[in-house]
Amino acid sequence: MASPRPLRRIPAAPARARLKERYEDAATIYGIPYWGKGFFHISEDGELVVRPTREAARGVALKQIVDEVALRGITCPLIIRFPQILASSVASLNEAFARAIDEYEYANVFRGVFPIKVNQKRVVVEKIIEAGRQYGYGLEAGSKPELLAAIAADLAPECLITCNGYKDEAFIRMALNGVRMKKKVVLILEKVSELDRILSVAKLRGVRPLLGMRAKLYARGSGKWAKSGGEAAKFGLTTPEMLEAVKILKSRRMLDAMVMLHFHIGSQITDIRKIKLAIREAGRVYAKLRALGVPIQYLNLGGGLGVDYDGSKTAFDSSMNYSVQEYANDVVYTIKTICDEENVPVPTLVTESGRAVTAYHSVLVTNVLDVADRIEQDRRVRVTSGDAPVIQELAAILSSTNAKNLRESYHDALQYKEELFTLFNLGHLSLEDRSKGEILFWHICERIHRDLKTLKEVPEEFEDMEKMLADTYVC
């Protein structure tokens, strides 16, 4: 992608200084250096720049794109996709595992799959397939249309197609047809009852299936989807159910069909400690199954690899306290250690990462229709001796607020704000009185916020004041 075209002449020195201030303000307010992951950047004139390959020389200003498509008659709202970001994300994930495998001398490989349900756009899936071909990167399907698309996709021979979700006879037949076509289509058991159905259809079709089973681990994830894992999870086989499935396969001389162990403890896992616990438990389950003679080849860690949406690098729901490389290192090291202890071969590692691959690649652009100001700068009130005492008290606080009494002024303002609404609800104040009181309160907050910038340390109770005073954009 070409570099941004210069849209204006180089400004004079004082103007350049102002632009630098704009850049620093934008970077601070929007936090792009923290969550942009190298794909997004603020230019020196304060514009948002996208770097699809993370190379500064190949960046493009988002405004420039919007202006150019507007010349073609395309107006907002619109979605701009950057396929290069998809390719970069696929490469980052696979190369992180490659580095970990090399560092820890892991005697097997990584074979990731992309869950089609995360983004079913054909252009997205095809770009991921193209970018992942050199890594043997496959697909995950959870419905018949997705499975049909996965089987028809131009995947490399070593690529996996994993099948999760509900499996009726039509779905099973479709998967078995894929196996007949020499595709590595793995049907993952979510319930023991699915096994008899799969084996019956496979016998009728004359195809030996490739099977996996989803373990219901004791370990749980973190974040909004933590309940997807743990003992109360909706899907997955308990330990007795896994042993029952093994017994059924042994009795039918089809134990060699069980090639994958799978688990999933939730999407957007925010805390690496939860991931480590799940990996350790799943590694032991894998090793014990191998010791029982189950020839599992793949350990599928499911999804959950997070995205640091807010750039805080914490375990909050909108963030993650680990990197992709740390994730890969922990997976490889933990599984290798357990397999060495149990004297079993290490499995091929599989993940079903979706959001971590696609989250950054598209940008929604929309027009701002209006701005709702919390405080209208030109709105002032005139307080007289005839005004209610609560109004006069708020006016006095406003006039006396300074850097030395910010906390006291704020506490007093909150008290009189409560009194204002109480008196209004009791019928002792007019609508005009209430309006005056509200305006005075917000002007007090604005003055406090302004004076906070002069302090070295901001008191904890004022940390959310910037959000409280923020304008609301109507899009």
Regions found by a protein language model. Name each.
Residues P77-I80, A87, L189, S318, ...:
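Intrinsic disorder
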Residues I29-I32, G38-H41, D67-L71, A152-D154, ...:
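A general structural signal for short secondary-structure junctions and capping/turn motifs
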Residues Q84-S92, E244, E281, D330:
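A non-catalytic, amphipathic alpha-helix used as a structural packing/dimerization or gating element
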Residues M258, I265-C475:
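C-terminal active-site-proximal or functional interface alpha/beta core segments in diverse enzymes
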Residues Y104-N300, L305-V307, Y322-E326, T334:
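Active-site-proximal beta-alpha core segment in soluble small-molecule metabolic enzymes
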Residues A2, R8-R54, R58:
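N-terminal basic/disordered segments at the start of proteins
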